[in-house]
């Protein structure tokens, strides 16, 4: 990744960074909840973004 990024790329990376987190604990605690973990987690070494 170049150190000089366009704003579009930077915005794209920022969004992916925000998406890449576990689900909040209070969501796990909700009644009738079936979501136990974030299935769309991405590891920087295993799965690349395809830029």
Curated annotation (Swiss-Prot):
Tell me the leader sequence span.
none
**Keyword S-adenosyl-L-methionine tagged:** no
One GO CC annotation, please?
A: cytosolic large ribosomal subunit
GO MF annotation, one: structural constituent of ribosome
Q: What happens when the gene is disrupted?
A: Defective sperm formation, resulting in substantially reduced male fertility. Male mice show smaller testis sizes, lower testis/body weight ratio, increased ratios of abnormal sperm head and tail and severe subfertility with significantly fewer cumulative live pups born compared with wild-type mice. The sperm count, motility and progressive motility are reduced. Female mice display normal fertility.
- Which locations, inside or outside the cell, does it occupy? Cytoplasm
Superkingdom: Eukaryota
Q: Which residues form a coiled coil?
A: none
Record's keyword terms, sorted: Cytoplasm, Ribonucleoprotein, Ribosomal protein
> What's a Pfam family in this record?
Ribosomal_L39
User: Any one Gene Ontology biological process term?
Assistant: spermatogenesis
Classification via InterPro entries: Ribosomal_eL39, Ribosomal_eL39_CS, Ribosomal_eL39_dom_sf
> Is Ribonucleoprotein tagged as a keyword?
yes
Tissue specificity annotation: Highly expressed in spermatocytes and spermatids. Highly expressed in embryonic stem cells.
Q: How does it assemble?
A: Component of a male germ cell-specific 60S large ribosomal subunit (LSU), which contains RPL10L and RPL39L, instead of RPL10 and RPL39 paralogs. The composition of the rest of the complex is similar to classical ribosomes.
Summarizing the function annotation, the protein's role is:
Male germ cell-specific component of the ribosome, which is required for the formation of sperm and male fertility. Replaces the RPL39 paralog in the ribosome of male germ cells. The ribosome is a large ribonucleoprotein complex responsible for the synthesis of proteins in the cell. The male germ cell-specific ribosome displays a ribosomal polypeptide exit tunnel of distinct size and charge states compared with the classical ribosome. It is responsible for regulating the biosynthesis and folding of a subset of male germ-cell-specific proteins that are essential for the formation of sperm.
The family this protein is said to belong to: Belongs to the eukaryotic ribosomal protein eL39 family.
**Record HAMAP family:** Ribosomal_eL39
Q: What is this protein called?
A: Large ribosomal subunit protein eL39-like
Organism field: Mus musculus (Mouse)
């Amino acid at each position: 990744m170049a150190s000089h990024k366009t704003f579009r790329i930077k915005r794209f990376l920022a969004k992916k960074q925000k998406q890449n987190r576990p689900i909040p604990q209070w969501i796990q605690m909700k009644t009738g909840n079936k979501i136990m973990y974030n299935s769309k987690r991405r590891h920087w070494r295993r799965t690349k973004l395809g830029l």
